[in-house]
Amino acid sequence: MVVREKQGGRMGKGKGKGKEKECDINCFGRSFFRVLLTLQSLERMKIPSSFNQCLQNQPTGMVSLVDRSGNKWSAELTSDSEGFFFVHGWKEFVRDNSIQCGQFLVFTYDKRSQFSVTVFEPSGIDKISTFSAHPSKNVIIKTESDEGGMVTAAITTEKMAPALKENNGITGKRTRDVDYLMEDRVVVFKKSSEANVCESSRRKRAGASAGKSKVTSTSHNSTRGSSCSSDEDNSSSKSPNPPFLMRFLSGEVSRRGRCVSKGQRQLTVISQRRPVTEAEKDHALQRAREFKSKNPFAVQIMMESYVYVGFFMNIPCEFVRECLPHTNKRITLWDPQGKAWEVNYVYYSDRSVGSFSGGWGKFAVGNNLEKFDVCVFELVQKDNIKVHIYRVVPEITPHKLRSDPK
């Protein structure tokens, strides 16, 4: 988009105000679009330089971002020598609308300090999930405990995800803190035309049959034999485990679903990895994006609430809707060494989203996952997911574990 340059020299005070008003009238209603291609654009988005002329009378500071349903988010508009940017608050808008790399956004400058935003999929179709997006707020949700029951999760942090309906009729509720969706990052969904796992799952759900088909589990050997194009580390399960880690993996140390109610301690993993660079993070993501398979798969970047504390991992929405069960159940994760890990898969029907809860912490700690590592979740068989790990730092440095007083 090219905006005509303002011509003419200095003008009188009266003419200046008239020109400013005329500029606003000409610019309000104009649009620009951005394709989100980098991780940085999910946290700090640059407005095209050709649109700067329309913002010459727009003061920097807080502005409103409005979705197609009329919901509003606040974000800070800043400027520097490179141009205008959306910064503080932009990350929350991205998270609440499940915006991912590869999607593109159309911004319309409605009026002073307000932009309307429409999100489109890479296919060019507007994103359906944005219709149900809402600004972040404090919520109470239900998540599944390690024992298979439901746990009441009291979320007290600001900037949280939209409320999720409770799953009534499940007992055994306990209170615990959840760091949920605080640092959700880019997800990528890929589905090969050869894959039929998702299609068969949808047909079975649409059939509304009275009985449930028997689940065929993937054997240890067959999962080992599946092709793997990642640089997964084969030493993670062989590395010596600290005594506290072994106690946690064996279940001796109280897990997150039961700590708060007993007045005990909540498990926290302390990373011993060296500091990492943005280039290393991008390189890990790039390697994961090069993964190819005939099976459907999703890419997820590990964040603090997934691997250091809380151990509650959000699964890419498209992967959940297209390929995973639309009910709570146990799912088997297969690590790069072929070891099986049972995890609780929690499905929220009102938004068609899912998460890994009980058991995910054991998988994350057992495989020494770190923040910014990238995992590819490949659906190799019904309720069986092979996890390919792309580490930011290939060398594994065992975690330290501690129980923080609550």
Curated annotation (Swiss-Prot):
CDD domains: B3_DNA. Residues 214-225 have a biased composition (Polar residues). The keyword Repeat applies. SUPFAM superfamilies: DNA-binding pseudobarrel domain. Keywords: DNA-binding, Nucleus, Repeat, Transcription, Transcription regulation. GO terms for molecular function: DNA binding. InterPro entries: B3_DNA-bd (IPR003340), DNA-bd_pseudobarrel_sf (IPR015300), REM16-like (IPR044837). Residues 30-123, 298-393 bind DNA. It comes from the Eukaryota. This is B3 domain-containing protein Os11g0197600. Disulfide bonds: none annotated. It is found in: Nucleus.
